[in-house]
Amino acid sequence: EAKIRSTEKTVMERIPPRMKIRYQAPIELPHVILLCDDWKNELLEYITQNKGNLSKLYEFDLMQKGGHIAGWLVDGEIKEQFIEKLQQYEQMMADKYKNLSEHPMYYAVGDGNHSLATAKACYEKLKKNHQWKHVENHLARYALVELENLHDDSQQFEPIHRVITGTDAQELIETLKEQCCGKDGQEIKCYYENKEEVLHLNLHEHQLAVDKVQTFLDEYLKENSGVIDYIHGEEVLRKLASQENAVGIELPAMEKDQLFPSVMTDGTLPRKTFSMGHASEKRYYIEGRAIK
């Protein structure tokens, strides 16, 4: 029922080590990407259109082919108008997905899921150790995030394929066909024993191909030999699948319109569902915030 939901399963073992660092830290320098489903491109575009009226905080070139960056302080009337537009956006989301969920999500954590989970855990610990009046307005109650539009042209979803080595290729493919496939459905390509075969997955509404395949592989590899790896690029996949006792599964890219419905209906996405951008395009740690 949360308005903000994780796109990947939180590994609870990762939280305590992060808490040790954050709980006594005076500042946070996180990178949490919060994706909004602004198909009308009205929310962040409002800031872009008005940045000429804002105070520029920084502008410089980034290292390691990272390009150029500039930042403005959103303040005053423009900030108030932006907050109003956020409220309008959330109402639009409630209307858009009312038939899918009684409590639709408004934002998806696209990156930094564990950073955000750690921030929440630290604040919950503060609440246990202090009276409410001392923590109600504590700086650590809030986390710094970067809001991005899922539908922005700069957001490119790229598929992450699967290769299984050290396995009986024929048996894996036959079991996959038996348990997950039919005459029609979402196409995937399988490479094994120097062959290429197109299969059709039986998916329920809003289910992703990667969800079906990953669930199958997790169960199959509990009982059968094989090691799974996650591969970018079709050419590399085919090369690896040409090995003896190997299977390559080429998955389709997830459409942007699939993200929110999939998380609302099936929960967190399988690991390595998609990739957003290349290494040189990733965000740099620039903004920070006091948390104590």
Where are these regions (language model features)?
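Surface-exposed, charge/polar-rich loops and edge strands
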Residues: 1-292
